[in-house]
C-alpha cells in the first residue's frame, strides 16, 4: 500500500449521499469536442440525420482510425462550432433506443479472444476514446501499444462518488473489462483502489493508495508505479468505462449509462444519480440546485468546467456535477476581517482554529492575478517527486525545456489543480501546462 501524506482534503459542504438514485429522463445528449485534445474531426453526419446509438459521428484527421460514436439514438439537432470552426458540440435529440450491434461473446471466452478483435471492437464502438495516454492525455493511436494500463477505481476528488458503490452493481462486467484491457498491453494492468475496497481484480495487479487528495489521481498512481516519459507511453481509463467495455463484449451493445455524484454547497439533494454519458445538464440539474445565482460545473470543483451554453452537457470523462454559488459580491474591507468563515491552507484566517469545519465555498478567487509568491504552499499539496515551485515558475515563464526536465510530461491539468487552488498569485497552472505539452508535442 502506498500512503500519500502531502495534499489537501478540501473542506467543502455538500458531500453526496453514497446511494444511487435514478435521474430524470434525458432528452438531449452531446459529444463535446473540447474533451478531446487536438481533435480535428471529419464529420460523417449532418444536422437532421437519424442516428443509432454507437453509430459513427466523426473521425479524427490527426489520429486516423479513431471513431467517435453517438451516445444515443435520435436526430442530430445541432453541430456547434466556435472560432476557426473548432468543433464545440454535436447535440442529439434522444428518440428511442436503437443501437448498432457489435460482436458478442460468452464471458468465459473473453480471456482467449484475439487481441486485434478486442481492439477493433473498441474502436468501432467508440469506447477506444475512453482510453487516454500519458504523456499528453490524448486518445491513443489505434495501432499504439501501452507500456501499462492504469484503471482508476479510487476517487479522492472533493464531493466524489465512492467507486466501490458503483462497481458493486456490475462486478462481473468490471472483471470482464479488466480481462479485455490486458489484451491491449504487453505490460501490466494496474487496478488502483482504496485500501480494503471490495472491487474485483480479475488478473490485474492490485495497488492500494491511502491518504488525502491527490491519492486518487491517476497521475499519482503513474508516478509511483510506472512513470511516463517521452519514450514510454502508459494509458489510463476510468472504472465506469471498464464496466462499459465488459458489457460491450458480453451484451453486444454500447452501454452509455453513467453514475454522477451531484454535490456542492448549492446542491439541493447531494447524492449519486444514474443518468447517461453526455447528458444535458439543463435537464439533469433542473430540480437539483438551490435558489440563487449558481454555477453548474461538469467535473470536480478543483478542475471541472462551467457547463453553460453549447457546453451545458456532462463531460466524457467526468463523474461529478458540482454546484457552487457565484461569488460576485464584493466584501467591504474583506482583507481586514478575521475570516472565521473562510478557508485558507495557511493560517491567515481565524477559521484555522476549527480544523474540522466545512465551508460554503463559492466561485470567488479571493482576489485578482498577481505575482507568484513561493511561500511553501505548492510543496504542501504536491506528493510527487518533483520541485513544484521551480516547475510552476518555468511553466509561467515559458521555459518548457526546463519544465520537461522537472517532470512536466508526467502531468495533466488535474495534477496541478491543487497548486492553482492554493496559489497566492491566482494562476491557473493547468492552462500553462497544456501550452507546454502542446508545444513539446508539436515541436518534438
Curated annotation (Swiss-Prot):
Keyword Iron in annotation: no
UniProtKB keywords: Ion transport, NAD, Sodium, Sodium transport, Translocase, Transport, Ubiquinone
UniProt cross-references to Pfam families, sorted A to Z: NQRA_2nd, NQRA_N, NQRA_SLBB
Keyword Ribosomal protein: no
Gene Ontology MF annotations: oxidoreductase activity, acting on NAD(P)H, quinone or similar compound as acceptor
GO BP term (any one): sodium ion transport
Reaction catalyzed: a ubiquinone + n Na(+)(in) + NADH + H(+) = a ubiquinol + n Na(+)(out) + NAD(+)
InterPro entries (alphabetical): NqrA, NQRA_2nd, NqrA_C_domain, NQRA_N
Residues making up the signal peptide according to the UniProt record: none
EC number(s) on file: 7.2.1.1
Superkingdom of origin organism: Bacteria
Family indicated by similarity: Belongs to the NqrA family.
Matches recorded under PANTHER family: NA(+)-TRANSLOCATING NADH-QUINONE REDUCTASE SUBUNIT A
Entry function: NQR complex catalyzes the reduction of ubiquinone-1 to ubiquinol by two successive reactions, coupled with the transport of Na(+) ions from the cytoplasm to the periplasm. NqrA to NqrE are probably involved in the second step, the conversion of ubisemiquinone to ubiquinol.
Subunit description: Composed of six subunits; NqrA, NqrB, NqrC, NqrD, NqrE and NqrF.
Protein name per Swiss-Prot or TrEMBL: Na(+)-translocating NADH-quinone reductase subunit A
Lineage: Bacteria, Pseudomonadati, Pseudomonadota, Gammaproteobacteria, Alteromonadales
